[in-house]
Amino acid sequence: MIVEVGGTVGDIESLPFLEAIRQMRKDVGRRNVLYVHVTWLPQIGATGELKTKPTQHSVKELRGIGIQPDVIILRSDEPIEEETLDKVALFTDVDVHAVIPLRTARSIYEVPLQLERAGLGKLVTRELEIPAAEPDLTDWQELVSRIRAPRPEVEIAIVGKYTELPDAYISVSEALKHAALHHRVEAKVRWIRSEQLERMEPDEIAAELRGVAGVLVPGGFGYRGVEGKVRAIRWAREERVPFLGLCLGLQCAVIEFAREALGTDDANSSEFNVFTEHPVIDLMPDQTDVTDKGGTMRLGLYPARLEEGSKVREAYGAEIAYERHRHRFEVNNTYRERLGEAGMWFSGVSPDGRLVEYIELREHPWFVATQAHPELKSRPNRPHPLFRDFVGAAAARLGLATAPATHSAPSESPAGTPAAQSRGAEPAVAPAAERDA
């Protein structure tokens, strides 16, 4: 278990948490807890000297509440001299080999390599008496080499409600970066505030999106900005630009396509318009009587059965995919046949066929949306299959070479039995942190 306590030592907000980790060592034993303290070494501009006094004071404050750091990691923009490490070790009563320098890196993915070179991994395993083999960091080193190498840009528009604070979509933007590294390109994000598109004419929207190689609409809740997302999706569909929709992005894609297929602007979600004539997105009938808070929300890990020949089946390389969910409304099954006849392919559904999990457009080069949040499973050296293929399609649109797909072994049922795959509407049990993601 890793416990991270942020903030500054001495802040009143963090005192209960520091007391908790102090007691943790008493509860589980000295050799089962390791205190790692990360501090900043400020530099004096005139002399260029790195000052250790803030670190000394921080450790003094920790000692005052009963915590003696076992490891100190020193952050700095500049190289840290050996004499500075010795000084910190002397005045904090920490072994000099446990004072780890960590200079600011060009990429956060270089940090694990820096820490390994400094011996942090061996120190942790030795202090906690954990048997561990020498780590094979070949793949990670290759990843860092790709990051350092010059790469052509592929610009992706993220059309969202919360773009004023890009960290609101940090998992999405990082998943794009992971996929871009796989294809040896650089994902450049163009942040588009969906509300501003609602006030634009079609030609203005085209100008706002012109030049992007792909459009991504992430998740969200509430009506604000939804019509702007719908308009961006219409542009991607009509211009045949690669599109990826996540959670609300799928629902907006269904709304946009339904308006075209049904010949009406009144197709909508009952979340946004309870009086809509065509509620193509709606609560399932067995959800409408649930009144407990959160009771109608589908949370956690769910399986989906992927159709043969679909882009999602090709991406995952498996018949069953497991993804995490956090949503309340579903595609209204009443409209599935009519939308299917118009060209929408429900390419992934729950094992019992009741719930739509993935959609595609048959006549579009790459138009995929999922009701799930696949961005949460992407890793730097293992990009999520949907993001990988989305960025690949965007790069191909620019005439850039792309890397082949690398499929991992198909996901197994979290419950471990085929029966778990047949319960389309029942979630597999997931940790609380995943259920609330």
Locate the predicted segments by residue.
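Short FAD-binding loop at a beta-strand-to-alpha-helix junction that anchors the flavin cofactor
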Residues: W366-A372
